Amino acid sequence: MGNGLIYISLEVIVACLISALAMYYVMKKIYYARGQAVLKSASAKAKLMEFQAKSFVEAEEMRMKSQECKLQQQYENKNLQLKAHFDKKEAYLKHLEAQHKEFVRDEKRYLEKEKQELEKERQILEQEKENFKKQYATCKENQSKALDVMLNYMAYTKEEIKSMILKQLEEELEAQKSALIRRYEKEAKEESKKKSYAILAEATARFAGNYAIENFTNRIALPCSEYIGRVIGKDGKNIEAFKKISGVDIEFSEGDKELCLSSFNIFRREVASETLKILIEDGRIQPNRIEEVYHRVVRNMEKELLSEGQSVVLELELGAMEDELKILLGKMRYRSSFGQNALQHSKEVALLAGLIAEQLGGDKKLARRAGILHDIGKALTQELGRDHVSLGVEVCKRNKEDPVVINAIYAHHGHEEIMSIECASVCAADALSAGRPGARRKSDEEYAKRMQALEEIALGFEGVEKAYAMESGRELRVIVKSNQVRDNQVPIIARKIAKKIEESAQYVGEVGVQVVRESRFKTTATLKQ
């Protein structure tokens, strides 16, 4: 019984051990398989990450190479630009050097010619001196002989005869002296006249400047005739808004492919032309857009005035100059006198004055400076309404310009005597530039003055902000300040302006006065979620 139980227990234990071993083996197989699967998955992920890393590195390398190529291209382009700029500057300097050498050669020839002429004059004077000595010796000898003869045959003392002879000689010498003075005065006048003609001829021959008559119109090309309708706008709103803000007339014919802008004020016309070009190129033409573009163009053109003046100063090699004067030089580009552009005229005067002063032994640089500034007051006449001479003197004194410049401003209109060679050169150059046939047109200047006078009449009334003379003086458009003028005052101002025009106008016709009062209010709405 006991042995049987032991046997059964052993069988159970063996069976349990076998089951446990079998279970262990099975579990080992299962975990091994799972481990292999995890290892394979991890290996695949590692390979994927490695592939992604390689792809990222390759992409970055390609991007860096592309960036490097781009930078290399930019560097090469910049290098080419700098090289082209350097070559241009080098060519310009060589050109200047050649001009300078030619000028030096001309000066040497001129000085050599002058030296030869002086040598001839010296020889002539030496010969005349010798002749005079001989004549004097002969005269003394004849005087002594005559005195001896007279003493022998006349009842006069030696002193009396000597006195008579001296008196006669004195009268003869006085007559000869007068004749010589008249002869030398005539020769000096003829010589100075020839010399002045030669100087002016050489100065004008060495000067070659651009020249163009200023007109009162600008023409704007259109892509097609349909753009005329877009410029006019619905019910004419666009063209009215453009005229109101610019003060410039627009003329066109149906079917035309261009617009004509007309105004006596060059700056106003240039701003309007640039504004219209931008609007046509952009395609969006509406009142708000017109006003926005117009104000932007005005700001940009006012910024360019200083750089324009700086270019003139560098071109003429004038040295340092105050910014206020440079800005006024830039403004002169948009001023005209008798149809002649004020800046172009002043540049001509500066160059000619420099050449003339150089021939006369004056300061070429100072003469150029006085020439470019002699009409500087014309840049302020439209705003301040005074004569350009007093305005030019005032602004030049404020900027501490040389007294020669002040004298040139006064003297070129006869307000002062000419005090220097440089001033005389400026006056002569001004007469040459203005007096050239076709350089000036009197009718254009009279028309511009008539238009400006109409605007000045309106601007003289209190509350008037802007005034534009339009339609060749047949219409005066006046814009008043809304914060100073009430609606019921607008008709009164219009009648007063019309009456003032009637009293002061010196020509026949009618002028329509249109007074505009406009109020604008602007605020900002804040949107919250």
Curated annotation (Swiss-Prot):
Membrane topology, record value: Single-pass membrane protein
GO cellular component: plasma membrane
Annotated SMART domains: HDc, KH
Keyword RNA-binding tagged: yes
InterPro entries: HD/PDEase_dom (IPR003607), HD_domain (IPR006674), HDIG_dom (IPR006675), KH_dom (IPR004087), KH_dom_type_1 (IPR004088), KH_dom_type_1_sf (IPR036612), Ribonuclease_Y (IPR017705), RNase_Y_N (IPR022711)
Segments forming domain KH: 216-297
Chief localisation class: membrane
Compartments where found: Cell membrane
Keywords: Cell membrane, Endonuclease, Hydrolase, Membrane, Nuclease, RNA-binding, Transmembrane, Transmembrane helix
Listed transmembrane segments: 4-24
Gene Ontology molecular function, alphabetical: RNA binding; RNA endonuclease activity
Family: Belongs to the RNase Y family.
UniProt-listed PANTHER family: RIBONUCLEASE Y
Record's protein name: Ribonuclease Y
Source organism (scientific name): Helicobacter acinonychis (strain Sheeba)
